[in-house]
Amino acid sequence: KGFINAAGIESPGLSSAPAIAEMVTDIVKELLPLEKNPDFVGTRKGILRPDTLSLEERNKLIKEHPEYGNIICRCEMITEGEIMDAIHRPLGARSLDGVKRRTRAGMGRCQAGFCSPRTMEILEREVPMSMFDITKNGVGSNIVVGYNKEV
C-alpha cells in the first residue's frame, strides 16, 4: 500500500509514457488530497541569447545588465550573462560541459581553449565553488588538481 510500480510495464516505449503518467496521477488523487498550485509555471524560459535581439534591444539589455556585453566565448559569441543564466536557472550548470550544453560556450573552433578559464572563474564566483571542485563533466573529471610547481 502506498507504492505504485510503473516500471517494467510492457509498452511501446515513450509513446505510452503520458498515458501511464495520467493513470498514476489518477491513482495518487484517490490516495491523497491534491490541489492545484496556482503559482505553478509549466514551462521554463530559455536562456536569453543577445545575438538574436535587435541592436536597440541588445543595447538596452547591456545597459540594464552589463554582463551581457562581456563576451566570454569569442568563437560562439557567448556572453557572461548567458553563462550566469545557465548557472542560476533551475538545475543549473555546475561543470564546463554543463555550461557548454546550455549555452554553446566552448563549442567553437578553439574547443574552449580560450573561454574555459574564464567560464571556470564565473562558475567559481557564481555557484560558488572552488576551482579545485570544477569539473569538465562530473565526478572524476576535475580540471585543476593543484597549484603550479606542486603537481
Predicted features, each with a name:
Residues 1-71, 78-91, 96, 104-107:
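C-terminal catalytic lobe of FAD-dependent flavoproteins
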Residues 36, 96, 129-136:
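Short, surface-exposed acidic
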Residues 79-90, 113-131:
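Iron-sulfur (Fe-S) cluster-binding segments and ferredoxin-like electron-carrier domains
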Residues 100-116, 133-151:
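Short Fe-S-cluster ligation motifs
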